[in-house]
Structures are given as C-alpha cells and as structure tokens.
Amino acid sequence: MFDKQKNRYIRVELASPDQIRNWAERTLPNGEIVGKVTKPYTLHYNSHKPEKDGLFCERIFGPIKSGICACGKYHGFVKNLPEVKFCKQCGVEFTDSKVRRYRMGYIQLAYPATHIWYLKRLPSHIATLLKMSLKEVESLVYCDLFLPRPIIKKPNLLKVKKLFNYDDQLWKETLPRFFSTRSFESFQNREMATGGDAIHKRLSSLNLQKLIFQSYNEWEKLSLQRSTGNSYEDKKIQRMKDIIIRRIKLAKQFFENNIKPEWMVLSVLPVLPPELRPMIEINQGELITSDLNELYRRVIYRNNTLIGFLNKSNSTPAGLIIYQKRLVQEAVDALIDNRIGNQIMKDRNNRPYKSFSEIIEGKEGRFRQDLLGKRVDYSGRSVIVVGPSLSLHQCGIPKDMAIELFQPFIIRDLINCQLAPNLRAARSMIQNQEPIIFKILEKIIKNHPILLNRAPTLHRLGIQAFQPILVEGLAIRLHPLVCGGFNADFDGDQMAVHIPLSLEAQAEARFLMLANSNLLSPANGEPITVPSQDMLLGLYVLTMSCKQGIYIYNEQKLKKKIPYFCNYIDVITAYEKKQINLHDPIWLKWYGNLRGTSSTKKQKLFEIQCESRGTRRKIFENWHFCENIRNRKFTIYLFTTPGRIIFNQLLEQSIQATVRI
C-alpha cells in the first residue's frame, strides 16, 4: 500500500527491467513465481471469469471478490496478517479485492522495443545521445536499416564482401548461392544488428562521463570558430552548438539520477492493474472494455508470434522474423502513444484507440482529473472582479465567504473570550451574524494570509498569497496588475480561495508567495505585473486631451478661454468643484526648467508677443514662457489637462515610495 509518511511526492522517471519485475512478481507458498502475463485473453466468453495468466488473471492481480478464490471457495481474510493464505488448487490469494487497484503484471518481450517517448518526442533523446539523425534512428528501430557488428577476430559482412571481390566466373556463380542459404542468414544475424536490439547495444555501450567530456571539447572547438559571413554556415554552426548543449544536459541528468540510457529500450513491459483498465458487463452479457486492454492484447499476440518464429528460426524466413519484430515495436508504440506512432491502431469503427499517454495527460487525464482535482477543506470559489482601490498584496473577500472559511477560528476566539459558552452557541451567533462576529473576523484576517489559485496552474505564479479585505457582494476583488501571473481577466473567470493552516504554511505564504514579492516572471525574468487591457485604456482616457479638429468643438474652443493655474492644488480644487472637466485644456505654471519636458526643441514657434517694458512672450504648441531684456526666462506655462496632472501626481507618489523602500 502507499505509505503517506514515507512517500511524500511522486516522480516520473525511467525504470529498469529488474525494477519492473520487482513491481509485479510474487512468490507463492509452493515456490511458484507469478506476475508474468503470457496470454492475450481477458475473460472467459461463457463464465465471464478471468483467464489464467491473462490480462485479468486472479493469480497475478488478486481476487475479484474479497476472500474468494477462482474456485469459488471462501476463506476470509485479515488485513495486515504476516502469513499470506493461498488456495492450493488455483493459487489465488485470500485477500481484499482492492489489491487489484495497485498490483501490476509484466510482459517479457521477445525482442527489445524502443520507448516512443524518447524516440519521437522532439527533441529525440535517443538521437541526441547517439549523435545520429532522427531519420536514421527511426529507420534502425523499424528494421529499415542494418548496422554492422564489429567483433574481434571475426570478419563482419562488409569485410567478407571485400574478400570475395573477384572477377572469376566461378565466384560470380557461387556468391549468390551463398548469400541465399540458411547459413548466411545465421551469419547475418550474428554480424548485423537492427531494431530495438541495435539501439539497446549502442546505448549500453555509452560512457556518460566520457560523452560529456567529448561534448565539451566539441563545444570549445566550435566556439573558437569565427563568423564565416555566410548565414547558412553560421546557422549550421549554431545548430550544432545547440545539439551539443542538449546532449551535455541530457547526459548529466542521466548520470546524476543514476539512470542508464539503455533503459529507454524496453525488454520488460509493465501491465497496469486491472481496476485502472476495467472490463464491465452491461445488458445481456455484453462487455465493454478499456482501449488499453485491446492494445495490451495486440502486444501479447504479436510477441507470442515472434517467440514462435524465434523457436523455429531454422524453418522461418529471416525476412518474416524481421517483419514480426517491427510489428511488436509498432504494437508497443500504440500502447504507449497511439498518436505519434508509424501505424495508428483503430477499432472496427475506425476510431483510434486511446493509449496510455492520452489517459494520463490533459485536463481530463489521470493526474489533473483524479490526483490534482480533489476538493479540499477550508477552500471556496467565486468570480473575480476588479478592485482598483486595493493594494497589490490585497484582495477583497466577500463577507459570507470569509465567515464560512474562518468559522473554526471565529468559534475558537468566541469561546476563548467567553463570548459564547459552547460550540452550539458560537455557531448560533455566527448564523445570526451578530456585529461582534465581524470585529473578530477582521482581527483574524489581519494576520492570516490566504491563497488564490486560478486553474490551470501552469507555473508557480498560478497560486499567490494575499492579505484579505472584507468586501460586500459575492465576488472576489483582485488588483488588476496581478492578472498577468494568473493569466486571468475580468470576463467571468473564477478563482479558488485556500487558507494555509499550519504556521509553516502561513510563513511560506507571507514571505515567499505574496503578490508584491512576485513581480518578475520566473521563466525569463521580465516584469509580469505590467498594465494591460483595461488599465491601458484607463490611462489613455485619463491623459488624453480634448478633441480638436472637429467643427462642433472648434466653436466652443473659440468662445471659452483657456484658464491659467499656479500649481497642482489649484487644478485639483477646480476639478473637484467641477469648474473644469478632466480633459479641458489648461495652462499650468512650471517652476522648473524645460529639460524634463519632451520634444521642446521640435515644437514650432507660433507667436511672439512684445510688451512695452521690453519683455517678450514666446508661444509654442504645448508651452509658452516670458523673457526679459537679457533673454532670461522668468515665467513658464505648460499646456496640459487635469487628467495628466492627476496621473503625474500618482506617478510621483509611486516613485517616491519605491525610493524610500
């Protein structure tokens, strides 16, 4: 069984053939070892009972009914009993039927089959380690290509052909006869390698440390080469560098995790527990089954056929054996991933079978649907809406949701403060929503962060911590700048609320997961809290000026004078009193120089006004100033709007707050 204390995480990695056998093999009291599936049968057509040594065998996977063997005898069972009891007649263990959910079997392949994930998933790990192209590796795996096997003190096929290179007529007649005999076929099997066996031997001969050292030397040689000036050659060199880096990283991962490269070629194929690939009886004895059972059956059929051919290799043509090896490889490919294999296997309705990869991946896969999609306590869910008045690290939680989530904390404080005599009275006070409840709730959430999560959680910013604020309504309020990390918007998206309970979880949420501590993307280091969508539109509306160039507005502009203001406070006061609008043009007195203003040199001079005292007033498009006789500016006015002034004030406050931090 799965021990929660010893096994705290799940890791997916390559398993060795011995480890797969250890998962499945068990020894009966009579010394017989079970676990190997040798027959492609599932249930008997008449009795609907599992076939012996088949895909649903009770000797391998356990009894269908608790305490009842295949013979129908009931013996009963006791959990955690050191002595395991078996039926002497059928060899089935008297135990709980739940063991069929985790007991595995295995198929001993007659010929190694390459794992399609490491062959065809790009980039191909096998091709990277072997320094071969993907096309060459695929041709070798599917028996379209042969490799010579150099053996010490034994000639290989290529040397034999060179030795027989004579022009004598006798040799021309003798050689074709030799290459078509049985002796040559055995000679070819000894000297030539193809299929998964060739890949297995090449991978097993790799020395990972030596491969890493050689790859570093190749990288240094390529890095010393200068640009050739030819874009094609430069791209080719860069592509070679990328392949070398990929090979070094892959070899390091294999070496550090103590994984052998030859494990990417399967000689033992694990069989999933029968409860994970069920076969169900419906009306009138009709059976429906999982697609995995059909794919397993095809693997066993073809593997057994290959075993028969190899046992009769003297009378079986070599070409037929090679073709059967390819069929076994294609059957294993379809079982693991039926979408990327050479031959997509379909049922009688021309529907592709659902393979193992399709069952575990995706939103409805085994991991996200069954393992990650669990409902948990102290959690809630609601629609998100924008909260423009919130700080970056705050979120608005509806009062009803907060009362329900923090109910145990409220009850504890009510009893500790002697405001409620018992649990029942405390719950009654919460249901009546007495005023004291909200005071206690605000005190609790002040020092208790919450976690917000939006599915799918594709990276670590998909779940962040916030300081909760009680709000009215039924929706969760969120600062718009944190939407980038969640990939959320306010068009009906929902988010889940979780409460960290332990002190360790609360400390992690407060110091590592708060939204104001996750401003950069973990993928590329770029800022992720940037304004977008509604925020950009709001900034545009806030800072735009009144409409110009339209006839109906030109007449109003001529009638109304542009007001002058001395400082920000006068502008904000006039705006709050509704004397001016957000987009009305105004002249604002500027007390600094014009170096900070944009495009001051590019603006055209519209008008120069000369006064009797010798002063001059120069008027430009967005600013004007007064000069004395010595050409010194003493009064400067900027052409702006109240909206731009408000935006500038907020920007100054943010910069000053950042500098203080």
UniProtKB/Swiss-Prot annotation:
Residues reported to bind Mg(2+): 489, 491, 493
Enzyme class: transferase
Main localization (coarse): plastid
Pfam families: RNA_pol_Rpb1_1, RNA_pol_Rpb1_2, RNA_pol_Rpb1_3
GO BP annotations listed: DNA-templated transcription
Residues that coordinate or bind Zn(2+): 69, 71, 87, 90
Reaction equation(s) it catalyzes: RNA(n) + a ribonucleoside 5'-triphosphate = RNA(n+1) + diphosphate
Entry annotated with the keyword Chloroplast: yes
Transferase among keywords: yes
EC number: 2.7.7.6
GO molecular function: DNA binding; DNA-directed RNA polymerase activity; magnesium ion binding; zinc ion binding
Localisation: Plastid, Chloroplast
Keywords recorded for this protein, A-Z: Chloroplast, DNA-directed RNA polymerase, Magnesium, Metal-binding, Nucleotidyltransferase, Plastid, Transcription, Transferase, Zinc
A single GO cellular-component term on record: chloroplast
Names of required cofactors: Mg(2+); Zn(2+)
Cofactor remark from the record: Binds 1 Mg(2+) ion per subunit. Binds 1 Zn(2+) ion per subunit.
PANTHER family documented for this protein: DNA-DIRECTED RNA POLYMERASE, DNA-DIRECTED RNA POLYMERASE SUBUNIT BETA
Function as written in the Swiss-Prot or TrEMBL entry: DNA-dependent RNA polymerase catalyzes the transcription of DNA into RNA using the four ribonucleoside triphosphates as substrates.
Subunit description: In plastids the minimal PEP RNA polymerase catalytic core is composed of four subunits: alpha, beta, beta', and beta''. When a (nuclear-encoded) sigma factor is associated with the core the holoenzyme is formed, which can initiate transcription.
Family indicated by similarity: Belongs to the RNA polymerase beta' chain family. RpoC1 subfamily.
Protein name, per record: DNA-directed RNA polymerase subunit beta'
Organism: Chaetosphaeridium globosum
